[in-house]
Structure formats: structure tokens, C-alpha cells
């Protein structure tokens, strides 16, 4: 315990000393709490994430940061034509991890993200792309095995999103095709959560998709056919379909969603059904959020199993620019075996001092019944253009 507290103190000192610029990609915590009912109000993507719209940049500049400023591209120094949108994200991270082993704790300071964003729009059609470097805390040791569906060379350049879309209006029908995450779940920014990591939405697991849907302030629906990324050899080898329907309630301060996904590969198949919910309690500046999924796992060559992946938490937004989020999680590989569950608790403190900048501190502990707890501390410093 003292060792982990030492990590916390040391990391806080490093945070105060460094204060490198930062920002985050997409926060589902800002749905309802910021006045936006749809993620696509702030992002060009129909499901949120990626480049910000003019509405989203105005919100960053005037409402979501501690001190107001210009959320425009390049802080308003460069005015882009209407058909062209650009962006960039830079993130550096300090990671400390302690799994109880004799050589613990371990720590690393590494570049976590360096991405460029591009959007070309022509009437109702657009091309969108995100490209950059794969984050890596340490250099890989040893050769990559054949058939592992991992990049087999040291080239760390990757495009995690690129797609063409047809969307005549910010509300109504849309179609898009390319590489991106199928709309599903809470879409937390943290890829380590079980509802992302263990359901096919981990870091760099974007699939190639044909997706369509319909967006309204009161509701939205998305249907996606997906296949593996054979171009860059990243992600999973699953192919299948996913659907997501969300309904806004209580004067658009709450949302309830139902979702299904079927995925199949040589390793087997899995059918997922789940519910997602959010409720913003304005007088308390509190957003409750949760997701629960039951998975029917059908591995090749062995008996099927019922699994569970869930998350429940809350975000407290006391003043402009400050967001405190806590949540608990569980992933059970077999609901018939009480020892199969892994539980986790996470706390995130995010500060948006000025448009384009964010500082975040993350503390996480996770443990199974049969093993020691794994404690992780992550400090992120992120800037977006």
C-alpha cells in the first residue's frame, strides 16, 4: 500500500512540474450535462468521436473550459474553407503499474498519441480520416508469431479511422463505409474498460464497416455490418453485425439504449445483448451512467459459456472545466463459475483549463478472486489543434 501511495505522490509531483498541454477525444459524460443531446452535435461522426463540429468547438471555447478562449482550429489563427476541416492530437503519458510481483512497481513515460485529422466535404458526401503513430510504452521484444493478426514490422504508422459518408443533414438518415468503431455501448474514451476491451472495441480494434442509421434529438438508431482490418492487420478477426437504438427521455436529460452484436471468427462466435443508460441530475451537477451486457460465447472446440460485461458510475461536474468520474466494472468469463469474475474500480480527474488543453489523472485497481490486485496510475497531458 505504501508503495502505491508513493507512486501517487511522485506522479502528482510530476504532474505539477510538467503541465504539458492536453485534450481528450470524446467524452460521453458531456452528453446531457453540456446541453447536447446527441454526440453528433459536437462531432462530425454520426456516433461521436473524432473532429469537432463548429458547435463542439464553440462549446470547448465558451462552456467546457475553466477559462474561456477560442476553440476554433489553431485557436482561430487559421480560417479553413467550409469543405476542409483539419485537426491534430498530441498526448504524452506517465504510467505506473504494480501487480504485486517482486520486480514491481514498473513505470514508463511515453508518447501516447500523435494523430492528424482530415475531413473533406462535398455537399452531402465527405471523406474522413485519422492517422498517426501507434502508442507503445515499451518496444516489443521478440518476433511477432504468424497468424497473430498483429503488425509484423516496426512501422508504427497507422490509420485507425478512414471512411466515406453520405449525410445530407445533421439530423436524419446517413450511410458510411470504411474503418471505424461500430456504434455500440457507452463509447468511453478509456479503452481499458471491460465493456470496450472485452467486447471487440479495444485500442486499434476498429473494423471495416458498412453502417447506416437515423439521427433525431429524441432518438437515434445505427446498424452496422463489420469485417476485419486485413489492410493494416490490426484489430480482431471477427466479422458480423451490430445494432444500437437510443431513446432520450425526461426532457432530454436522460437516455436509454438497447444494443445487440453478433461476431464470428475461426476461434468461435459470440452473441451480445445489452442495455445502456444515462441520467443527468442538473441540481447536483451529476451524470449517472451504466452499461450491462450478456454474452453468449461459443468458442470453437469447447462448450459455450454465458459471460457478463458491465460498468456503472457517475461523473461530477462541479465547476467549468472540472470533471470527476468514478465507476466500477465486472467482466465474468463464465456466469456459472463465481471465481471467473474480474472486478475493477476506476477514478478519473480531468481538468480542461483552457480550450485545446487537458490534464488527466487516472487511478485504477482490478482483481480476480484468485489473484492479487493490479494497481495502475496514469497521468495524461493532451493537446488538440
Report residues per predicted region.
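Outer-envelope beta-barrel architecture signal
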Residues: 80-88, 123-125, 171-173, 217-221, ...
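Hydrophobic, lipid-facing positions within transmembrane beta-strands of outer-membrane proteins
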Residues: 68-72, 84, 112-116, 157-162, ...
Amino acid at each position: 500500500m505504501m508503495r502505491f501511495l508513493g507512486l501517487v505522490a511522485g506522479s502528482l509531483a510530476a504532474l505539477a512540474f510538467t503541465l504539458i498541454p492536453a485534450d481528450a477525444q470524446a467524452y460521453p459524460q458531456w452528453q446531457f450535462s453540456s446541453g447536447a443531446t446527441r454526440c453528433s452535435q459536437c462531432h462530425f461522426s454520426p456516433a461521436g468521436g473524432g473532429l469537432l463540429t463548429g458547435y463542439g468547438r464553440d462549446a470547448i471555447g465558451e462552456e467546457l473550459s475553466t477559462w474561456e478562449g477560442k476553440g476554433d482550429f489553431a485557436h482561430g489563427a487559421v480560417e479553413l474553407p467550409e469543405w476542409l476541416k483539419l485537426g491534430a492530437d498530441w498526448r504524452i503519458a506517465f504510467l505506473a503499474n504494480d501487480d504485486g510481483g517482486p520486480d514491481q512497481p514498473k513505470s514508463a513515460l511515453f508518447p501516447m498519441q500523435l494523430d492528424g485529422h482530415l475531413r473533406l466535404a462535398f455537399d452531402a458526401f465527405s471523406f474522413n480520416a485519422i492517422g498517426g503513430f501507434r502508442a507503445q510504452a515499451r518496444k516489443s521484444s521478440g518476433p511477432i508469431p504468424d497468424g497473430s493478426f498483429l503488425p509484423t514490422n516496426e512501422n508504427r504508422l497507422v490509420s485507425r479511422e478512414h471512411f466515406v459518408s453520405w449525410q445530407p443533414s445533421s439530423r436524419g438518415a446517413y450511410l458510411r463505409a470504411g474503418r471505424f468503431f461500430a456504434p455500440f455501448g457507452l463509447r468511453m474514451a478509456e479503452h481499458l474498460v471491460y465493456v470496450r476491451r472485452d467486447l471487440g472495441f479495444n485500442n486499434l480494434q476498429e473494423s471495416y464497416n458498412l453502417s447506416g442509421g437515423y439521427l433525431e434529438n429524441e432518438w437515434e438508431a445505427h446498424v452496422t455490418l463489420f469485417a476485419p482490418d486485413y489492410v493494416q492487420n490490426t484489430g480482431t478477426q471477427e466479422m458480423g453485425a451490430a445494432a444500437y437504438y437510443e431513446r432520450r427521455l425526461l426532457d432530454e436529460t436522460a437516455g436509454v439504449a438497447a444494443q445487440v452484436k453478433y461476431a464470428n471468427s475461426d476461434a468461435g462466435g459470440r452473441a451480445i445483448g445489452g442495455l445502456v443508460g444515462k441520467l443527468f441530475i442538473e441540481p447536483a451537477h451529476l451524470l449517472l451512467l451504466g452499461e450491462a451486457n450478456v454474452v453468449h460465447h461459443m468458442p470453437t472446440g469447447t462448450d459455450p459459456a454465458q459471460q457478463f460485461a458491465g460498468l456503472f458510475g457517475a461523473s461530477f461536474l462541479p465547476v467549468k472545466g472540472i470533471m470527476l468520474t468514478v465507476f466500477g466494472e465486472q467482466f465474468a468469463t463464465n456466469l456459472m463459475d463465481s471465481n471467473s469474475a474480474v472486478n475493477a474500480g476506476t477514478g478519473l480527474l480531468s481538468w480542461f483549463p483552457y480550450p485545446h488543453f487537458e490534464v488527466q489523472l487516472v487511478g485504477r485497481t482490478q482483481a480476480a478472486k484468485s489473484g492479487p490486485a493490479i494497481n495502475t496510475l496514469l497521468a495524461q497531458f493532451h493537446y488538440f489543434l
